[in-house]
Amino acid sequence: VEILKMLYREAKILILDEPTAVLTPQESRNLFNILRKMRDNGCTVIIITHKLNEVLEISDNVAILRKGKSVATVKTSETDALKLTELMVGKKVTLSIDRPVSEYTGNLLEIHHLTTENDDGVKTLRDVTFSLNKGEILGVAGVAGSGQKELCETIAGLMKVKKGAILYKKENIIGKSPEEIIKIGISMSFIPEDRLGMGLVASMGMADNLLLKRYKEGKTPFVEKKEARRLSKKLIEKLNIKTPGIDTPVRQLSGGNVQKVLLGREIESAPNVLITAYAVRGLDINSSYTVYDNLNEQKKKGTGILYIGEDLDVMLELCDRIMVLCHGRVTGIVDAKDVTKEQIGLLMTDAFGKEEDSDEQD
């Protein structure tokens, strides 16, 4: 709607911040065609995006920022993704994502007919059914607001369920406390979209935030910080976390380092189920690939990973299967190796009419 408003006003200078985050591939292509026509008619268009393929497709010139400073401006026709990445990060990186073959078999979680509502009684998830396997990265795609946030928060036990079941070894875990869930064998980690509001305590340092996952493990009535401080130093080295100190409030860290702290805390708890919501949103290329590598490490250990993402190119490389949501419904579950971005885009708009069919059944 905001994009249409600007086009209607015949703006001469148009600034777009991540304009394709809520668009399907087909809609993105249409938008780019419109922007090219605006450029040809004398308009100036500035696009802020983290998707290098979009930068190379639509722009004439590229300005690269690093740590709040402009480091270069280059002609798009004279550069490529590797050169841009090197300018962004300050060193050479490899733009490839591994997809290791899982050595594990069997389901970890089975979700059946999951239905949830918001405070106004509007359904946010509608009859969602799927399984999460051991040693699998299951991607969840869809335009923004299609139920991704509600799905991961419901599985994590943060939202009430109107109907349905979440089964672990045939036992329904809906309504069980975290302690009860742990007793039946599930070690679940959740990396939420809101890193500082829900994932970490912004005013606390790294060591204290790590204690939030471990404060009950001590042998005395008092909180023992020694292990948390040791783990903090380990994660700083392993994940290359940039922080003045382990007691520095995490709100003073960059977005990438905040995410590394949260990711490190969750994977160090040795989960067998890991839920991530937009794990690399706002991160630089280098930090993003660190996240992908760590997710693959967990996959190799047999962890089932639910990966909610917005970059379809990454999901096609990283994930084993991709589940597509549209208006809270599953419109398809596909093998990432055998599907194209365009086919996923059609599922994101429910082009095959599954939502309509389901509504008729309701």
Give residue spans per PLM region:
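Glycine-rich phosphate-binding loops of nucleotide-dependent enzymes
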Residues: V1-D362
